[in-house]
C-alpha cells in the first residue's frame, strides 16, 4: 500500500559529539559531512532552523532537499515562527497556532513530528498545498498542546483534542 518512508528528525545535540573518542579524531566539518551522508537516506527530513543553518547553511527547504541525493521532503520548524516546508514537489510556509500559556516545551518537536506522520499516513500522503497545510497545522497543534503543561508524556495530545482545537480556529 505505501512505499517505505524513512523519516529523520535530526535532533542535533553537539554535546554528544564533543567528548566522544570518535569525534576527537575528526574535524567539525567532517562531522557535518558524516551527518549529511546519513541524512541522504531520508524520505522526510525534519530540521530545526538551527540544524538547517548548521548542516546546510540555508533555511530554504527546497534548496536543502536538492543538496541530498534522495531529494527528501523537508520540514523546518522554528519555535513559534511559521513552518517552512518542501513536500511532494510543493513549497510553502505555514503559520501554526501559538499561545501565551506555554509551560514547558519538552517534547514539542516530537509531538509535532508524531502528529505530522499520523496525519500524513491517515490522509494517504498529501498531494496538494491545502492537504499539506492541513498536515502541518495538525502537527503544529500537537506541538502546541504538548507545551501547555509540564513534561512530554502527560501532555501528549489526543486526536480528538487536536481536532477540537483546530475546529475552534475555524469557527
Label the predicted regions.
Residues 1-5:
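Conserved small/polar residues in nucleotide/adenosyl-binding loops
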Residues 59-171:
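Conserved phosphate-binding/catalytic region of the ribokinase-like
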Residues 14-93:
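Conserved phosphate/ATP/ADP-binding segment of small-molecule kinases
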